[in-house]
UniProtKB/Swiss-Prot annotation:
Its main location: cytoplasm. Signal peptide: none annotated. The modification Phosphoserine is found at residue 5. It comes from the Eukaryota. Keywords: Acetylation, Coiled coil, Cytoplasm, Phosphoprotein. This is Coiled-coil domain-containing protein 50. It comes from Mus musculus (Mouse). The gene is Ccdc50. One of its GO terms (biological process) is sensory perception of sound.
Length: 305
């Protein structure tokens, strides 16, 4: 086998070979560092996107729950208001019926009183027609006197006693009318007191229901706020964020050391990836409703008065 001869004059020097080897090694190291940086960048982007998607889902879920709670609360307020309106309308109808009944009763009483008065007048006229007029003692003679010798005739005594009986009957009728009116006033006052107590009871029930609704809504808001804070302060999320920050810091230091090296050719160009900034969403909760106290019952009551 023939020996291969090597021209020693064309061989490069040791320094040139070392320099070329150093350049090749630098290229290889730069390429590996760049690949590591790209992989780290992709991993951080994926993790960021996952966090953003998770935050979006949580925010959307909380917003839907808040909207549902508001809709339910508004529905309950409307139902309570409608119930108050129905109660007020019922009370107003009862007051109207009571006033109409009282008016009819008063009219009947007036008619009865008028009939009684006409009857009394007719009886008085009839008594006057049937009662003879006496002129002294000439009708019965001069000897028609009392046993005690008085001058008072018997016919005049009967004429005086008849108006006394009529006035006594009128007094009884007047007393009965006053007693009836007093009894009606007492019944009316009792009915008014019962109605006022019912209205006050309805107002108290409405106030208690409204207070319970406010407490329930406040508890729901506090529960949502605590769950959101717990998700924000989750230790697993903190550990993931710290590891991502340390990896990015190591990549930045390696890249800085690569740039600081002198007299090295630029690394091969690579396609860069654009960073996607995470979008933060804030969940704005609506404020609580101040429903005024339902005054429909009071309005109906005062309108009637």
């Amino acid at each position: 086998m023939a020996d291969v001869s090597v021209d020693q004059s064309k061989l490069p020097g040791v320094k040139e070979v070392c320099r070329d080897f150093a350049v090749l090694e630098d290229h290889t190291l730069a390429h590996s560092l760049q690949e590591q940086e790209i992989e780290h960048h992709l991993a951080s982007n994926i993790q960021r996107n996952r966090l953003v998607q998770h935050d979006l889902q949580v925010a959307k879920q909380l917003q839907e729950e808040d909207l549902k709670a508001q809709a339910q609360l508004q529905k309950r307020y409307k139902a309570l208001e409608q119930h108050d309106c129905e109660i007020a309308q019922e009370i107003q109808e009862k007051l109207t019926i009571e006033a109409e009944r009282r008016r009819i009763q008063e009219k009947k009483d007036e008619d009865i009183a008028r009939l009684l008065q006409e009857k009394e007048l007719q009886e008085e006229k009839r008594r006057k027609k049937h009662t003879p007029e006496f002129s002294g003692g000439s009708v019965f003679g001069d000897n028609y006197y009392h046993e005690d010798g008085g001058m008072k005739p018997r016919g005049i005594k009967e004429a005086v006693s008849t108006p006394a009986r009529a006035s006594h009957r009128d007094q009884e009728w007047y007393d009965a009318e006053i007693a009836r009116k007093l009894q009606e006033e007492e019944l009316l006052a009792t009915h008014v007191d019962m109605r006022a107590a019912q209205v006050a009871q309805d107002e108290e029930i409405a106030r208690l229901l409204m207070a319970e609704e406010k407490k329930a809504y406040k508890k729901a808001k506090e529960r949502e706020k605590s769950s959101l804070d717990k998700r924000k302060h989750d230790p697993e999320c903190k550990l993931k964020a710290k590891s991502a920050h340390s990896k990015s810091k190591e990549g930045d230091e390696a890249h800085r050391s690569k740039i600081d090296r002198p007299s090295r050719p630029p690394p091969p160009t690579m396609m860069g990836l654009e960073d996607t900034d995470p979008t933060h969403f804030t969940n704005q909760h609506s404020t609580t409703w101040h429903l005024p106290k339902s005054e429909s019952s009071q309005k109906g009551f005062h309108n009637k008065q």
